[in-house]
């Protein structure tokens, strides 16, 4: 039986996705390669989303365990101003 592949972490998945997008944006990939890259990009996106959802769940659980701590939403406009 082949050894199990160790899943790559979020940062590696995100870096791979960014590199893939950059390659595709150059516009010089053959159609078949573009389709394979797109499929890989979808898989990487789903993996990143799943990891983010798991991290959010873990943070929420930790906050709830601490008691009356209020959660505030992330303000993208405020972050962009930094």
Swiss-Prot record:
GO biological process: DNA catabolic process
SUPFAM superfamilies the UniProt entry points to: XseB-like (SSF116842)
Subcellular localization, as worded in the UniProt entry: Cytoplasm
GO molecular function terms listed in the Swiss-Prot or TrEMBL record: exodeoxyribonuclease VII activity
Catalytic activity entry: Exonucleolytic cleavage in either 5'- to 3'- or 3'- to 5'-direction to yield nucleoside 5'-phosphates
Entry keyword set: Cytoplasm, Exonuclease, Hydrolase, Nuclease
InterPro entries recorded: Exonuc_VII_S (IPR003761), Exonuc_VII_ssu_sf (IPR037004)
Family indicated by similarity: Belongs to the XseB family.
Subunit structure: Heterooligomer composed of large and small subunits.
Function text: Bidirectionally degrades single-stranded DNA into large acid-insoluble oligonucleotides, which are then degraded further into small acid-soluble oligonucleotides.
NCBIfam families: PRK00977.1-4, xseB
Protein name as annotated: Exodeoxyribonuclease 7 small subunit
The species this protein was found in: Cellvibrio japonicus (strain Ueda107)
């Amino acid at each position: 039986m082949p050894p199990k592949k160790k899943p790559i972490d979020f940062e590696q998945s995100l870096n791979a996705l960014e590199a893939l997008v950059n390659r595709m944006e150059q516009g010089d990939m053959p159609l078949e390669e573009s389709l394979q890259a797109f499929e890989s990009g979808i898989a990487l996106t789903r993996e990143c989303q799943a990891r983010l959802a798991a991290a959010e769940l873990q943070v929420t659980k930790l906050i709830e365990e601490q008691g009356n701590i209020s959660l505030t939403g992330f303000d993208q406009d405020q972050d962009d101003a930094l």
